[in-house]
Amino acid sequence: MAEVRDFLFEIGSEEMPSAPLQKAIAQFNKLVVSGLKDSGLSFGEVKILSTPRRLNAYVKDVAEATEEISEVKRGPKAEIAFDAEGNPTKAAEGFARKCGVNADALTRRVDTDGHEYVFAELNIPSVPATKILSELATSWIAALDWPRSQRWGSFHERYVRPVRWLCVLFGSEIVPVTYADVTSSNTTQGHRVLGPGYHEVATPADYEQVLKNAGVLLQEQRKDVILAGIKEVEAARPGSHVDMPEKVFEEVINLTEWPQVLVGTFDEEFLNVPSEIITESMLSNQRYFPIYDAEGKLTREFIVVSNADPSCAERVIDGNERVVRARLDDAKFFFEEDLKHTLDEFAQRLETVVFQEKLGTVLQKTQRMEALAAEIALDETSNKEEAELAARAAHLAKADLVSQAVVEFTSQQGVMGGYYAEAAGEKSDVAAAIREHYRPRFAGDELPSGQIGRFVAIADKLDTICGIFAINEPPTGSSDPYAVRRAAIGVIALVRSTANLDLKKLIASSLELYRQQGLVVDESVQSQVEQYFIGRLASIAKDEKISADAIEAVSAIGVINPDEFLQRAHAVTLSVKYSERYKHLPNLSVLYFLRESTLISATLLNTWANLFKRRKRFRRTVSFSSMTSTLSKKMSIGSRS
């Protein structure tokens, strides 16, 4: 058994951007693990460590050398490998080349099957780990794939930021590595302010402590320090809550080497600005964490995670307060300027905004949404007042896209429209619908809180889906530029929250609205859109552990109303399960199951009873899916039964 040592490979550079660094950590881990496996070196745990100025691989228990390997490989039959004069043929030369030996080194002998073959005897010597690690380390730096990399000086090598040092140790031995004229050593660099300059690392085991003494903490330590600081802030303000989106929090961890949690404030006047654009400005631009009070209202305070000398905390707070004041001044100006215009004015400006080159402007989209949202409201509620509210909300839903606030803070589309609608005196249902009509933005997201919002959301998403299919640009497995897949999942979730909507009818209505605006829509598009929804429903059914045969059977009959599709599929799966379990009492067992199911109507009980009385009539050659498809057609399930 070869002796083992720990291996340390640190790439030191100028400060790296946080988001690319986060992705590089996972990428670096794969490179290190695959490289060591391919090299033949045995190794233990691999840890990837990072700070804004370093990316590091720490590998436990790396063997000091590869094992010596003796191996015999069998090649082609001798009669094929050599000609009549005993000269090697192309077959022999190819086999020898593959094995890394000369054809003259091949031997001939009879194998266990009685035939004579050629053999290559391979003796692969042991290779020192230092040599292998030196080659691997150089290749790993070059192999890291950054969204944007750069060259510096007169060097051709690339990295996300200029490389300044390399600390590469195998035990106490320095592994020779050179990249962009930087040569490896046993030194690292500390914090720019708290521990500037080079610091010697005797062995990999000393690395963490050397960094700590030089004012640098590794990821988990930094995370713990930041969380502890935030808990102290919350404890000092009973009932308060610090908003820490995971993505921003991970970025902040990778922006500091010696984090310190500080609290800043902004002027009271900015609390009159919608809290969403205040928090977006702080989180997206400055990576500050807003603080909310016990009632969930935004306060004037925010958290800054500093990487500076702790003795300079007051100056750091003052500097960050000046930065946030400037940003919030802009947000306040945009909001107040927008309030000088009505949403109807903004809505007319949508004529200049392209929705999709072949599908016209956003104004045309809102006109289609108005008609479709009103139809959806009437289908669901039979209430003309609800239909008028839905049409009004759809008319104004996209108006804020041309507002100054949304141009600056794009993720607040809809939200700002809701504020402007309230300020203009629109009904609360309309304002809420405008604010929430983009929901659900992803699988599992909240639905709009009110009916009007759901009607507008369905109209918006269905209009996009039908339009993209109408111009023959449907999503593919690798491309979905218009987020059709996400829109379809949203429509399914929204329709499931209603009682009376017919998705097939709504698809037809949406396509007809495009025709009325002059778009030529092929008759086959209706079927294409329906099949797309069936595909999404099949995926949902699969996630709900419904059998593949049942999904196939229900898909075959063209059901696209979500609840009906899923309930039919569940019923087919469970009924077949019960009929298999109680073959000797088919009618009673299935009827017992059906009686216990809250999803299935009395009509279905009778249908299944009749079918199972005649089950002997089914030929054995009939496939399961064709049989269940037939049965599924006869079902009357769910709220429409």
Predicted regions: what they are:
Residues 1-641:
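Amphipathic alpha-helical "coupling" segments that flank catalytic cores
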